[in-house]
From Swiss-Prot:
It comes from Treponema denticola (strain ATCC 35405 / DSM 14222 / CIP 103919 / JCM 8153 / KCTC 15104). InterPro entries: DHS-like_NAD/FAD-binding_dom (IPR029035), NAD-dep_sirtuin_deacylases (IPR050134), Sirtuin (IPR003000), Sirtuin_cat_small_dom_sf (IPR026591), Sirtuin_class_U (IPR028628), Ssirtuin_cat_dom (IPR026590). The lineage of its organism: Bacteria, Pseudomonadati, Spirochaetota, Spirochaetia, Spirochaetales. This is NAD-dependent protein deacetylase. Its cofactor is Zn(2+). It is found in: Cytoplasm. Its main location: cytoplasm. The gene is cobB. Keywords: Cytoplasm, Metal-binding, NAD, Transferase, Zinc. Residues 1-251 form the Deacetylase sirtuin-type domain. NAD-dependent protein deacetylase which modulates the activities of several enzymes which are inactive in their acetylated form.
Length: 251
């Protein structure tokens, strides 16, 4: 237990002395909020035909494939609440310690927790757009129709509405990716949280920090390719952030 306490003390020390702290988050922090991991053992991709859900060619042919599966998984997100990782990161930002959150997630829970500088490298459902014209609408506007399982359509031209999430077959949002690379390069300490670092190009972001002389800490329940680059390795996200939160409240 003493060793664990020392490890948490060391992690907290690195967090608070960092000049440019950045967090890089993945699906593991969403599972704490009751959202299934896409690739986990009970994840969405383990269910029949769900790989078609985020296939851009399938969407253009038949958008009902996406909306039929997404009505609960995506448009039920309004009912989900941030977990302790989300709330502690928001607190760190509010205190001026954390400079940016880079996330692979599409659940908007960082924003719901109060984080302001959130970079969504796989796109965001906060905006939906017509695939034919320039019309856009909010998540909430689209969700009204999407929750029924129907395909939301543009009020101007009648074409399907698509979330600004990156589907398979689409490029990542370049503006967000460039901003993420900039933040990772500036970071002298990066928290890698709940991601196994398997999906590129986002998985390479810790390398930007390391290349520029920064350090990383990894909190994930599975090994990653960057484990050998740090001695700050933790498995339990919830426990780790409870320990960070306890120390933060004493500051």
């Amino acid at each position: 237990m003493d060793k664990e306490k020392n490890d948490y003390d060391k992690l907290f020390s690195e967090i608070t002395k960092a000049r440019h702290l950045v967090a890089f988050t993945g699906a593991g922090i969403s599972t704490l909020a009751g959202i299934k991991d896409f690739r986990g053992k009970d994840g969405l991709y383990k269910q029949p035909n769900t790989e078609k859900m985020f296939d851009i060619d399938v969407f253009y042919r038949d958008p009902s494939v996406y909306y039929g599966m997404a009505k609960e998984f995506i448009y039920g997100l309004e009912e989900k609440q941030p977990a302790i990782v989300h709330t502690v990161l928001a607190d760190l930002e509010k205190r001026g310690i954390l400079k940016a959150v880079i996330t692979q997630n599409i659940d908007l829970l960082h924003q719901k927790a109060g984080s302001k500088n959130v970079i969504e490298v796989h796109g965001s459902p906060s905006v939906h757009y017509c695939i034919n014209c320039s019309y856009t609408e909010t998540f909430e506007e689209t969700a009204k129709t999407a929750k029924t399982g129907e395909v939301p359509r543009c009020p101007k031209c009648g074409s399907p509405i698509k979330p600004a999430i990156t589907f398979f077959g689409e490029a990542l949002p370049q503006k967000a990716l460039m901003k993420a690379e900039t933040e990772a390069s500036k970071s002298d300490f990066m928290l890698v949280l709940g991601t196994s670092l398997l999906v590129y190009p986002a998985a390479a972001l810790p390398a930007y920090t390391l290349r520029n002389g920064g350090k990383i800490a990894i909190v994930n329940n599975q090994p990653t390719q960057f484990d050998s680059y740090t001695d700050l390795l933790f498995e339990d996200l919830e426990e780790t952030f409870e320990e960070i939160d306890k120390r933060l409240k004493k500051v």
